[in-house]
């Protein structure tokens, strides 16, 4: 069943290019990843939204996701509230509309 993961970030001022560049090759060898988009939410805020074949594919890609995060972690500000530098969620599609 199709699943998505979404991760919210706050990028340090002046680090936007490095943050975006770090994602250029994501998914090249990540089985089950269908599509990824990064959206700008304003004032240094970004979300990556990734479509996957299944929750199992997301779980299998976690080591690569962590490795990628470690490559750009220095570009991120703490989100506060004990969340650290990422605010991730994932789950199977509950409803889909055109």
Show the residue positions of the predicted features.
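A short, structured loop/turn motif at beta-sheet edges
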Residues: 12-14, 56, 98
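Residues in flexible loops and secondary-structure boundaries
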Residues: 17-19, 27, 41-47, 60, ...
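Conserved N-terminal glycine/acidic-rich loop preference
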Residues: 4-5, 19, 46-55
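An amphipathic, aromatic/His-enriched active-site/gating alpha helix that lines ligand/cofactor pockets
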Residues: 24-35, 51-87
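Short, surface-exposed ligand-recognition loops at beta-strand->loop->(often short) alpha-helix junctions
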Residues: 8-21
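Glycine-rich beta-strand-turn "strand-cap" elements at beta-sheet edges
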Residues: 1-3, 10, 35-47, 71-98
